[in-house]
Amino acid sequence: MDLLLILKAVIMGIVEGITEFLPISSTGYLILSADLMSFWTKEKADLFIVVIQLGAILAVIYEYWGRLWHALMGLITGKSEGPNALKNPRQLGLSLIVATIPVMLVGFTLADQIKEYLFNPYTVAIMLILGGLLIFYVERKQIPVIAEEAEDVSLKTALLIGLMQCLALIPGTSRSGSTIIGALWLGVSRKAAAEFSFFLGIPVIIGAGLLDLLKHKDVLSSGQDWLILGVGVLVSFVVGLLCIRWLVDWVSRRDFTIFAWLRIITGIIVLLVAWIFGYTIQG
């Protein structure tokens, strides 16, 4: 058993758990981490990067199970009763469905092309910088709040957030970043924007992870390969759960400017390294 490879999987799980819900691009940081550690072959690393996100999104389901159940029941029956009851459960359920449709269509059509041509440090660096500039722009605008809670998000706003999420298919953009910042831009409160982004990631990440695993499961040729993947998923679940709780508290007190600086600085460093040393994704 390769203990060093297991340690690298643990590190990748920590990176995923920390970055999945922050507006800094978990996929981008996973690609860079895999390159820096020479983690697995390119085919196995690419599969790992997509599937490991299942752990973090399972943390969302665990943390918000009560509200998600009420949203599902509200979508079916129109009612929400008991603990964690929502004032408008059907609206939340419909908004999440509407916001999910665009990225499902685009992702299903272009997933393989995106992985083949855009999973590299250059793309990550450029999108990190552009995303950081967008965060600066939105944070400096005085935008009136029109949706205090996640269930207040209208279908029109949900569709626009869903279109913003399509940008996150490009590594370095950040799914949480595009949806949270997009929601803030459209007048959703900070806490509601974060929670709507958490919920929106459930069908997208589960769908992408399971689809990629089914299509490329033959890449995992041994029991150890599956163990490595399982370790990464488990670690990302635990770390992701801690990060969710921290982020909800953070957004109620501060803005995302620090993450804009982090994105831009990281992007510039990666571009400089790529230019000076010819740094490219392993292949």
Swiss-Prot record:
The family database entries (InterPro entries) matched by this protein are listed as: UppP
Q: Could you state a single Gene Ontology molecular function term?
A: undecaprenyl-diphosphatase activity
Its cellular-component GO annotations read: plasma membrane
Query: Which Enzyme Commission number(s) are on file for it?
Result: 3.6.1.27
Question: What's its membrane topology?
Answer: Multi-pass membrane protein
**Which keywords annotate this record?**
Antibiotic resistance, Cell inner membrane, Cell membrane, Cell shape, Cell wall biogenesis/degradation, Hydrolase, Membrane, Peptidoglycan synthesis, Transmembrane, Transmembrane helix
An example of a Gene Ontology BP annotation on this entry? response to antibiotic
Please give the start and end residues of each transmembrane region.
4-24, 45-65, 91-111, 118-138, 153-173, 194-214, 228-248, 258-278
User: What domain of life?
Assistant: Bacteria
Give a short account of what the protein does: Catalyzes the dephosphorylation of undecaprenyl diphosphate (UPP). Confers resistance to bacitracin.
Entries under PANTHER family matching the protein: UNDECAPRENYL-DIPHOSPHATASE
What family is it from? Belongs to the UppP family.
Q: What else is known?
A: Bacitracin is thought to be involved in the inhibition of peptidoglycan synthesis by sequestering undecaprenyl diphosphate, thereby reducing the pool of lipid carrier available.
Q: What is this protein called?
A: Undecaprenyl-diphosphatase
Quote the gene name from the UniProt entry. uppP
